[in-house]
């Protein structure tokens, strides 16, 4: 595999439903480069499910084995991952964008609000995959996201938990 293309699976806020994650990770294990969970799994940090999954803690995770934030370096991107509650994401992206700049992140992944969100602020793409269990807000879909990163752009596609495409939730964000 060349490094001019990377695929990231992003999921968040399954709130105790282990089976939905197991199904998802098994489905994508062979086809994506990095699997990322943005917190509120409510599972043990030692769970065998987490093998090959990058993960952070959420406000409902009481196992202190999870990091609060992660910075992942791939051949194409610098990815900052956090749940979002520590950066007041319910009130906008300002606090998180300061942290993103500090981390020199190309891509910021977060959860917490249970709402699908995808926005480029300056050179950085901020993305919330929504909740795979308990969607909130105007888009009532139990969702996750696949990001295909190339040297030119981020290609974002949201999916339902049964692996079907949410067709109007496909976006391309050019890289600077």
What is each residue range found by the language model?
Residues 56-59, 65-106:
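Helix-adjacent hinge/juxtasegments
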Residues 7-13, 78-85, 125-130:
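Active-site-proximal beta-strand elements of phosphoester/diester hydrolases
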Residues 15-20, 41-46, 60-66, 87-91, ...:
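Active-site environment of divalent metal-dependent phosphoester hydrolases
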Residues 54, 90-151, 155:
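Conserved beta-sheet core of the metallophosphoesterase superfamily
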Residues 7-76:
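Core catalytic region of metal-dependent phosphoesterases/phosphodiesterases
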Residues 4-5, 22-23, 74, 103, ...:
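Binuclear metal-dependent phosphoesterase catalytic core
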